[in-house]
Curated annotation (Swiss-Prot):
Belongs to the ferredoxin--NADP reductase type 2 family. Binds 1 FAD per subunit. The keyword Oxidoreductase applies. It comes from Bacillus velezensis (strain DSM 23117 / BGSC 10A6 / LMG 26770 / FZB42). Its EC number is 1.18.1.2. Keywords: FAD, Flavoprotein, NADP, Oxidoreductase. The lineage of its organism: Bacteria, Bacillati, Bacillota, Bacilli, Bacillales. FAD binds at residues 37, 45, 50, 90, 125, 287, 328. Homodimer. Its cofactor is FAD. This is Ferredoxin--NADP reductase 1. GO terms for molecular function: ferredoxin-NADP+ reductase activity; flavin adenine dinucleotide binding; NADP binding. It catalyses: 2 reduced [2Fe-2S]-[ferredoxin] + NADP(+) + H(+) = 2 oxidized [2Fe-2S]-[ferredoxin] + NADPH. It holds the Pfam family Pyr_redox_2.
Amino acid sequence: MAENHEVYDVTIIGGGPIGLFAAFYCGMRELKTKVIEFLPRLGGKVSMFFPEKIIRDIGGIPGIAGEQLITQLKEQAATFKPDIVLNQRVTGFERLEDGTIVLESSEGEKHYTRTVILAVGMGTLEVNELDSADASRYSGKNLHYKVEKLDAFRDKHVVISGGGDTAVDWANELEPIAASVTVLHRREEFGGLESSVAKMKRSSVRVLAPYRLKHLNGTGERIESVTICQTESGLSEVIKLDELVINHGFKIDLGPMKDWGLEIEEGRIKADRHMRTNLPGVFVAGDAAHYESKLRLIAGGFTEGPTAVNSAKAYLDPQADQMAMYSTHHKKLVTQ
């Protein structure tokens, strides 16, 4: 029984953009809410990898830096004062006889809740580090796996290895301020948005594809140049650089959640149009969710979060209204 413990109406696992907006909407539905985040700060992948990237796929916002978006989402989420728990990875899931769900963290702390919203993105993210014996020597010096501050690359000769959307975006962001930007990709086709790839190819960015990194050349703790190899001909070339950025993708893992009995499809958590999973009282929103015609944009997640909250409210109180009143009429908001 959970009668001797504080029980929340909703516990949101994940403090990224979707989890934060869902926390705000929980307040709109007058639900006692807790947010549990694995990282030491809120913001998820946006704060971790794209703090200065300009996000342009949210209606009404022509462009906003990732960290500014997170700042505004945190301010919005704080409106109804949800409890925030950082630095805890949820590993255990148990349902008590009275229906209360017990979430246990890897630190052994237990969280009691009536419903759960999974806003975990693609799970825990770890970068694929460079497969080179010398990589660890240079990591944190001038070998980078993410671009935290664009200005740190100002007037520098930068080489980026990678061909996904993140690598392309970094190239476009750095091109106006760096002395030079060179992008290496092992395939001729790039994985970024067509418009972003076209912008990169029109710019001063030197695009070398198909090429791969062959060797890091340096003394002490800094890389001075890289040897690259044309994948078809095998011809090598040496490029001098100031900074090397690696974006070879991520290791993505739902971790212990895979053992909770959730239905997994294509590496994500299967949901219906109400964001319900196959487990009663457990809902999902954002990149973690999989359903037909899923829109993989932050804007899409901003719809899924409130949908999951409304479903949680209906689960707790079948007689409740289907959705919250509009924010323009909410007494707490209009009096601020």
